[in-house]
């Protein structure tokens, strides 16, 4: 029984260790996540057929961005509504260029990834402001967003992943964080390619499921070791938003005219 209890706690302990990043390591993880995203979008938009190794590398981007988001929202919880407002603004501003870039691949109603973080930040803000009623309102908001987020931005699994990581990185009770750890683990396992496991089990495991789980852990572990003594940020504040919108604008323009 003791062995089983230890095994059950492995995913939670691994995820909890991943949230322990100093500011320098956070910036390195953010930079590598952006690189993975750029490679994935280049592969998706400009290569035919897709390169499976680039697809696999791209699976690390969303979990890493979610981890950085979870760490950031827990640093200044009193600013959650301000952070939500900023995310909603950037999500709306970015949506036209997202639609331009992916107009041939995703349906018109598909939302960009910033809506995931805007919705989950709004849930946390409402929960902080109004308790159970705020939590219910935030859950309803995420339920509404899940469908338009599904084609391109990970849908329900992505929402569960982000909220779960925020709980693990926060100050909730050990039991709540333990349950959140399992929710995060299950969302990671099903985040990419779960619908293809029955028909293409080997390819799905090698290029989707395992990279989604292992690559983020490898990146975070490397960042923790390389940046162990870097306790100051070295990237410009909030540089992700213009880079995200800008690369979509550039990619969309190329796709449209070429």
Provide a role label for each language-model segment.
Residues 1-258:
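Alpha-helical transmembrane segments and their immediate juxtamembrane cytosolic regions
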């Amino acid at each position: 029984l003791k062995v089983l209890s230890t095994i059950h706690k492995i995913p939670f302990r691994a995820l909890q260790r991943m949230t322990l990043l100093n500011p320098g390591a956070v910036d390195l993880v953010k930079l590598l996540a952006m690189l993975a995203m750029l490679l994935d979008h280049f592969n998706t938009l400009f290569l035919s057929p897709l390169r499976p190794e680039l697809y696999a590398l791209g699976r690390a981007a969303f979990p890493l961005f979610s981890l950085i988001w979870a760490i950031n929202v827990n640093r200044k919880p009193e600013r959650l509504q301000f952070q939500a407002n900023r995310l909603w603004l950037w999500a709306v501003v970015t949506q036209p260029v997202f639609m331009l870039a992916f107009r041939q691949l995703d349906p018109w109603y598909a939302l960009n990834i910033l809506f995931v973080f805007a919705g989950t930040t709004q849930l946390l803000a409402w929960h902080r402001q109004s308790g159970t009623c705020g939590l219910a309102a935030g859950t309803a908001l995420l339920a509404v967003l899940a469908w338009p987020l599904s084609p391109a931005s990970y849908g329900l699994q992505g929402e569960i992943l982000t909220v779960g990581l925020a709980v693990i990185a926060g100050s909730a009770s050990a039991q709540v964080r333990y349950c959140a750890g399992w929710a995060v683990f299950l969302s990671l396992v099903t985040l990419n390619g779960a619908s293809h496991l029955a028909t293409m089990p080997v390819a799905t495991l090698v290029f989707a499921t395992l990279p989604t789980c292992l690559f983020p852990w490898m990146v975070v572990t490397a960042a923790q070791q390389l940046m162990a003594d870097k306790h100051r940020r070295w990237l410009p504040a909030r540089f992700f938003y213009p880079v995200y919108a800008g690369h979509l604008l550039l990619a969309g323009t190329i796709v449209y005219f070429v």
